[in-house]
Amino acid sequence: MKTFTAKPESVQRDWYVVDATGKTLGRLATELARRLRGKHKAEYTPHVDTGDYIIVLNAEKVAVTGNKRSDKIYYHHTGHIGGIKQATFEEMIARRPERVIEIAVKGMLPKGPLGRAMYRKLKVYAGNEHNHAAQQPQVLDI
């Protein structure tokens, strides 16, 4: 008996919609990364993108535990000398709430071309509406 290996053209990809209201950021991101990778499927193959598309709604209502709301700091660099920037979790939620979930999930995916392909299947929206109705996403309760 030969070991099964998924072929990229034969992978069945479904669309799911997740409501992030009141969900803990890390626990939500872990499950999203797992499903983007395809590890929940029997035909999971490490070197093939077998994951599903995931739409996350209400990113602004994601929860964090403890004092992370005021203490957690996100850093990025502009590329110029002395151009390091920082923002707290509260500031990120106020300015670009989608980025909080995107950053958390991206850090849990593989680094490299395959990880970037998996990351592109994540669609995050701050509000309660999305423009992927044509894909008929199924509600996923995490």
Swiss-Prot record:
Record-level Gene Ontology MF annotations: mRNA binding; structural constituent of ribosome
Keyword vocabulary terms for this entry: Ribonucleoprotein, Ribosomal protein
Gene Ontology terms describing biological process: negative regulation of translation; translation
Residues forming coiled coils: none
GO CC terms of this entry: cytosolic large ribosomal subunit
Residues in the signal sequence: none
Highest taxon in the source lineage: Bacteria
Family statement drawn from the similarity comment of this UniProt entry: Belongs to the universal ribosomal protein uL13 family.
PANTHER family: LARGE RIBOSOMAL SUBUNIT PROTEIN UL13M, RIBOSOMAL PROTEIN L13
HAMAP family xrefs: Ribosomal_uL13
Subunit structure, as described in the record: Part of the 50S ribosomal subunit.
Function: This protein is one of the early assembly proteins of the 50S ribosomal subunit, although it is not seen to bind rRNA by itself. It is important during the early stages of 50S assembly.
Protein name: Large ribosomal subunit protein uL13
Name of the gene this protein is made from: rplM
